Amino acid sequence: QRKKSATGYSFVMMIMVMLGCSVSAGAVTKNNADTEYQKGNYQQAIRDYEEILNNYGVSAEVYYNLGNAYYRTDNITKAVLNYERAHLLSPGDEDISFNLQFARSKTIDKITPESEMFFVTWWKALVNLTSVDCWAKTGIIAIIMALVLVLVYLFGSHIVLRKIGFFGGIFFVAVFLLSNLFAYQQRQMLINRTGAIIIAPSVNVKKTPAKTSVDLFLLHEGTRVDITDKAMKGWREIKVGDG
């Protein structure tokens, strides 16, 4: 009986291992997609990156690489779309920002963004210095450091150590609070995002939400707009970068 049980157990384990191997063999990895991209097989790389996103969820790096692959196939619209998605997840990444701006310069509509006060630009740059996850990790490290320094302040035997503990603790508490604030603001931007990319070759923007309404202007694929109202079914109120 024991032999039979052992044999049966081994047989089941072998099937499980074989199934695991077949799943692993069938799954596309980022390395596979990167290899296809490096070989110049951009269409295959696109399919692989999109499969990775479908199977494993969103990733700034994968969206960025997908944008690069689309750019290589002269699909500027899809390149802009995926750079925008990557930028949303990792707004502080300089490579993503550069490629996004470069791809935008290739679109038909040349729209200049509205100017804003210098301190608003500075604050946004600070908030977007890194990702939500990185701000969260910074906050955790900061609160741990603050607690350690509080203990140094409370139990330090020398006045110098106690001063370091006191002022260092205040500093890291401030870092903790700011990190959480920045993470919260970025998360709100992710949740309440209003940006959209026009995918159709061209779109007539109407004065009112009616097919018979006057055409105000024409927008082309790849142009970024902000949706300001979507209450009416089938229609969207938008705002373009220049107001």
Each PLM stretch: what is its role?
Residues 207-221:
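SH3/SH3-like (including bacterial SH3b) beta-barrel domains
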Residues 115-155:
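Membrane-embedded alpha-helical segments of integral membrane proteins
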Residues 219-243:
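SH3/SH3-like beta-barrel superfamily modules
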